[in-house]
Amino acid sequence: MNQTTRKNGYVGGALTFAVLATIMFALYVAGKVAGMDQAAIAFAEAIRSEIGTAFFRLVTILGGGMFLVPVAVMMIAVLYIKKYRVEAMFVLISLGVSEVANELLKLFFARPRPSGVNLVELPESFSFPSGHAMIGPAFYCMVAFWIAQWFAEKRWSSLVQPAVFIFVALLAFSRVYLGVHYVSDVLTGFFLSMCWYFLLRLGYEEWMGRRSTVVDPIPHSR
């Protein structure tokens, strides 16, 4: 796949998820999300079990700030030391922009969180859109992309990105299962995160492309 085709794919992916997010915003503003929210709550209640609750409590931790911040700090430090400085910058951009955008959107819409069954402590922040669904997925997908790229000669490398996509979908769903978000919160956040992921991929490709035209590229050197 040539560079132009890849870039077109990133733009197409970003636009697709931007449209989906816009639809969710429009449905929320129009008050048309109650049906899907109640259906998702009913589904989550129907499938709850002790094992499922333990599993999703673990999964949801991996998308929270208490986990992502120290992991990101360590990643940035290691990448910088190993001279993967472009990647270190993109880790910071990925999480920083997502966090700020999510907080601003939460404050703007000021949607209360679900009441009733909360299987983890209910966060004090507003509900729409979900921070776990908006911040973690783009970060994890970028990391998966780099791992698949750096270890392309390994047989398992082709499985990394599909496996991570399944994980981030479970991460997003965990918020509904645990009763701390409506599904409309989660879908909106997830669509925004995937849009941001494709924009990050596009930005990364552009940045690396410009560098290769200035200096002779050295494999695995930044």
How should these model regions be labeled?
Residues M1-F67, L107-F109, R113-V120:
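N-terminal transmembrane-helix/juxtamembrane module of multi-pass inner/ER membrane proteins
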Residues Y10-A14, V86-S94, W156-A163, T188:
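Alpha-helical transmembrane segments of integral membrane proteins
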Residues A18, V91, L95-E99, F190, ...:
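Alpha-helical transmembrane spans of integral membrane proteins, capturing the lipid-embedded, hydrophobic core
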Residues L20-I23, G96-A101, I166-V176:
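Aromatic-anchored segments of alpha-helical transmembrane domains
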Residues F25, I41, N102-K106, A110, ...:
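Membrane-water interface at transmembrane helix exits
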Residues A34, K82-A152:
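Membrane-interface loops
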Residues L62-I81, P137-V143, I147:
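Hydrophobic alpha-helical transmembrane segments
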Residues L119-R222:
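Membrane-embedded catalytic cores of phosphoryl/pyrophosphoryl-handling enzymes
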